[in-house]
Amino acid sequence: MKVRVYNIGGIVSPLEVELTKGVNIYKAPNAYGKTSLAKALVSLLTSAIKPDDLLNVFANSGYVELDLDGRTYYRRIKRVKNKIMESSKLLLDDDRALLLSYFSPENKLLNQIMSGEENVEWFISATSKINELKSKKEEMETKLHNLQAEIDDLNRKHKEAIELQTKIKQIEDEIARLEKEKESDKVLNKTTQTISITNENKLRDIKEKIEVKKRELEDLQNRIARLDQEIKNKESLASPEIRQSYERQLQEINAQLQKITAQRNEAEIEIRLLEKVLDQIRESEKQHLTTCYVCGSHVDPSIWKVRIDVISKELQEKNSLYAGIKKEADELLSKKSEIEKKLKELDQISSEISKLKMSRSELENRIESVKSTIDDLERQRREMEERFNRNAEIYRVYDINDSINKRIEELKKKKDEYEYELAINGIPSTILNKISEKQKELQEVQKMVDDLEKEYMRRLTIAREEFVKIANYLLKELEFDLRAEIDENDRLVVKRNDATLELRKLSSSERTTLALILVLTALKSYFKTPFFIVDESFMTFDQRRFDKIVKYLNSITDYVIITKSDENIELLKETMEPLASS
C-alpha cells in the first residue's frame, strides 16, 4: 500500500510512504505532520472529513492518494477564487471510520472514557447503525399496515362491484321485459312515436353529459380548495421570519462552538500532561526513588505522596472543568443539529409549496375548460327544448304505454348511476388482480420486517456479548486485575474482585484500554477497516502491554499504522505474530 500526501494539514512538501501488511511504525519529530498523515488516510474512508479541513490554509492545491490492490483512491483539492473544489474516489464512505480507524486523543469515545463518562449507548448506536435499522423497520411496519389497509379496501370494493353487477343485470332484465310488453301494446303511429322518443333520448343524453361535467367541476373545485388549505398550512410553517430566526441561532451557536472548542483543546492538553506527570510520580513513589525524574536533584521519598495529592487534586479540578466544557459543547452540537434539520425541513416545505401551486394552476385550467363545456351543453339543451316545445303539437301522440316508458326511463337512469359507480369502483376481475398483487407485496414486506427485527435484536445483543468476550480476554492478557461488561442500560461497568469501580478513578492506562476494547469490539462486529492507525504519543502503556495490543490489532486488520515521536524520520516494518483474537 503506497500513500502520497501534499499540502494536507502540516505536510507542505510531497510525502510518499509505502506500507506493507502487518505493523508499520512511522517515526517523525513533533509538528512534522504525523497527525496530518493519519487524517489524510482516514479521509479516504469517509466524506465526513471535509476538503476545507484537509487543505493547508496557505496552499492553493493539495492531495492524498492511496495505491491499494492495483487501484488508486484519492482526494484532490484546489482553491479557486476562495472556493474549495474537490475530485475524489474514496476507498469507502462511512463516517464510522472516524471512530473505528484512528485511535488518538481526538477520538470521541476515548475522550468520553477518559473523562469518566460510563454511558456508551451513543457509541453502540453509531457503530452498529442500529438507529438506521430501527427507522427502516418502522418504515416497513408502516408500509405493512398501509398494504393491509389497501387490501381491506380492495376487498370491500370487490364486494361492492359484485353487488353493482347484480343490480345492473336485474335492471337490464326488467327493461327487456317492459320493452317486450310495450311492443305488444303499441297503438300509435310508429314513425311519429319514433321521432318523439329520438328527441327525448337526445335531450336525456345532453342532460346526462351536463350532470357528469357538473360532478367533475365539483370534484375539481373541492380539490383546489383542499390544495389552498394545504398551501396555507405549509406557508405558515415556512415563513421568512422563521428561517431568519433559525439562521441567526445557527450563527450564534457556531461562534460559541468555536470558542468552546479552543477551551476544550486547552483543557485536554493540560489533563494529558497532568495524567502523565501523575503516573510518573506514582511510579517514583512506588519505587521509593530519591531522585527527581525531571531535574535529577535529591528528593525525600515522603514528598512523592504530597505531590500525588497535589497533582490528583489539580487533575480532578481540570477533569471537572473539561467535563463542563464538553457537556456545553455537546449541548450546542445537539442544538446545531436540530436547527440544521429544521432548515432542511423548511427547504422541503418550500419545494412542496411550489409543487402544490403548480398543481393548483393546472386545476384552474381544467376548471375553466369544464365550465366552458358545461356552458356549451346548457346552450344546446335550451335550444333543443325550445325546438321540441314549438313542435310539441305536431309530434304529440296518444300512447297507452306512457307509464311503461316512464318506468323504462327511470330504470335506465338507475342503471346509468350503477354503471358510473362501477366505473369508479372498478370491475371485479381487475380488483381481484390488484388484491393478488398487494397480497404478494404484503408477504414480501412481512418477510423484510421479520428479517429486520431479527437483525435489530442481533445488533442489540452482539455488542454486549462481544465486548465482554474481548474485554476480559484482553484485560487478562494485559495483566489488568479487572473485569468489564456493558449492562442493560448500555453503561460501561468495571469490577475488581466483584466490587464495582468508578470509571474516573481508574488509571489512564486502564481507561485507554477500555476505550480501545470498545473500538475493537465494533471493528469485529460491524465494520471492516482496511487499516487502523494508533497515535502512540498519548498511550500510557508500558512497552510489553502496548506490543500485545498491537498484536491483537494485527489479527483483525491488514494494516496497523503506529505514529511515534522521534528525532529522526523513519518507517519501520515490525514483524510479530498476531495475537489470537478472542
Curated annotation (Swiss-Prot):
Keywords: ATP-binding, Coiled coil, Metal-binding, Nucleotide-binding, Zinc. Zn(2+) binds at C292, C295. Residues 243-351 form the Zinc-hook domain. ATP binds at A28, P29, N30, A31, Y32, G33, K34, T35. GO terms for molecular function: ATP binding; metal ion binding. InterPro entries: P-loop_NTPase (IPR027417), Zn_hook_RAD50 (IPR013134). Residues 243-281, 320-351 form a coiled coil. Signal peptide: none annotated. This is Protein bps2. It comes from Acidianus ambivalens (Desulfurolobus ambivalens). The lineage of its organism: Archaea, Thermoproteota, Thermoprotei, Sulfolobales, Sulfolobaceae. The gene is bps2.
